[in-house]
Amino acid sequence: MDFKRLTAFFAIALVIMIGWEKMFPTPKPVPAPQQTAQQQAVTASAEAALAPATPITVTTDTVQAVIDEKSGDLRRLTLLKYKATGDENKPFILFGDGKEYTYVAQSELLDAQGNNILKGIGFSAPKKQYSLEGDKVEVRLSAPETRGLKIDKVYTFTKGSYLVNVRFDIANGSGQTANLSADYRIVRDHSEPEGQGYFTHSYVGPVVYTPEGNFQKVSFSDLDDDAKSGKSEAEYIRKTPTGWLGMIEHHFMSTWILQPKGGQSVCAAGDCRIDIKRRNDKLYSTSVSVPLAAIQNGAKSEASINLYAGPQTTSVIANIADNLQLAKDYGKVHWFASPLFWLLNQLHNIIGNWGWAIIVLTIIVKAVLYPLTNASYRSMAKMRAAAPKLQAIKEKYGDDRMAQQQAMMQLYTDEKINPLGGCLPMLLQIPVFIGLYWALFASVELRQAPWLGWITDLSRADPYYILPIIMAATMFAQTYLNPPPTDPMQAKMMKIMPLVFSVMFFFFPAGLVLYWVVNNLLTIAQQWHINRSIEKQRAQGEVVS
């Protein structure tokens, strides 16, 4: 395998890795025409829960939330510091229950039989508009007494934060002990957020982290299979004393935090039960049932949990709960992408600009890999210098493949050339390249981050395609520095590849293209220097080792 074939192989593998899930998604099973009575009840319950809302609006410096007064659901959440993907004049909407998509947070109290004791009761609030007063704003929703229980649901929003505390205040005047559990749920449809593309696709769907099962993704297609078969076979831990669970998408997430970092688990009274399922043809949910300590007659109690609904900012989410940063989708190379992003973040803290930090990171990675790349490029340079002799052998022996191969092997021996010498070092670099790709692609920190001039958002494509065109030019330059393929078909392919890559990179985030451009420029400089050095040695009659 020569360098050209390896480059083509790596390019194709990278494209397949990035685009496969988007280009060839797992088909969703067609819902069965008949539903059981239980399925119909679940569907009716879900649709009723998402009926038109009576809005209560809460505004802080980071979010604008809409709570349905009757159900107490968090029905809409706008992230005021982030722009919409498709319209920079509008803020980004994470939760919503409009015609476009459904994505809401719900919470209920259940009796010992699992029935919602607040069903059909409804809450009320003293006012419809809330805003920050100091560092916090509290929204108290009160329900009429039911089963001898007085229940309030309280939302607390904090300045500068995307954490929302959801608390039930319970006063038991029923004359008997109340055995309850709190059920916290995130419901959404399977629609893809704006910005998903063929080559820039990230996971969308339920996730759960537990000490027993670590981080697990539960795809919509797995839940469809469960719904179709009537079984619950999706792989995730269903009972845990701690952890977190929710939904993630590119750059953003919503998760119920069972145990805040350094705090007590909400599952202290007993293991929490996790349930992730398809609710009906349109909606999916991830929920956790938290058992509460028995509430004696005349006593008061509370059930409190934090909901994080916001950006996947590593420095923030890492301090909220153990391993919450795993929700940042680095694909299958999290172990490599995470330290690379850590280094990028440290550089940004020093430089103050993500674009320049990417450039410095690229230089550092190139320097670390220099021993590997130097060996590879020297091998390629020797192959390039021997190209005229290889071509002469090909012309001399024509179609006699055996004689041609023997002559070429003799030439390699005489010239001290290892035809595979450039392959292993390049193969060892592939994890680095893939890790860097995911570190840059998945990082919300680059969203809306400018570099210079026309690049005002490193997470979006170059609006004028300047970087992709420069990248294509650098790839063309590399083809002239590398040894020409002996196969005419390979030669044509290597000339076409820069054009194909440039078109593909038109749709890549500018931060990714910036990395490739800088990496290519450094590679050209290194290869040019090595080629010149070897040609000079040969001209002086020295043996090139």
UniProtKB/Swiss-Prot annotation:
Its main location: membrane. The chain crosses the membrane at residues 350-370, 424-444, 461-481, 498-518. It is found in: Cell inner membrane. CDD domains: 5TM_YidC_Alb3 (cd20070), EcYidC-like_peri (cd19961). Pfam families: 60KD_IMP (PF02096), YidC_periplas (PF14849). Keywords: Cell inner membrane, Cell membrane, Chaperone, Membrane, Protein transport, Transmembrane, Transmembrane helix, Transport. It is a multi-pass membrane protein. Coiled coil: none annotated. GO terms for molecular function: membrane insertase activity. GO terms for biological process: protein insertion into membrane; protein transport. Disulfide bonds: none annotated. It comes from the Bacteria. One of its GO terms (cellular component) is plasma membrane. InterPro entries: Membr_insert_YidC (IPR019998), Membr_insert_YidC_N (IPR028053), YidC/ALB3/OXA1/COX18 (IPR001708), YidC/Oxa/ALB_C (IPR028055), YidC_ALB_C (IPR047196), YidC_periplasmic_sf (IPR038221). Belongs to the OXA1/ALB3/YidC family. Type 1 subfamily. Interacts with the Sec translocase complex via SecD. Specifically interacts with transmembrane segments of nascent integral membrane proteins during membrane integration. Required for the insertion and/or proper folding and/or complex formation of integral membrane proteins into the membrane. Involved in integration of membrane proteins that insert both dependently and independently of the Sec translocase complex, as well as at least some lipoproteins. Aids folding of multispanning membrane proteins. NCBIfam families: PRK01318.1-3, yidC_nterm, yidC_oxa1_cterm. This is Membrane protein insertase YidC.
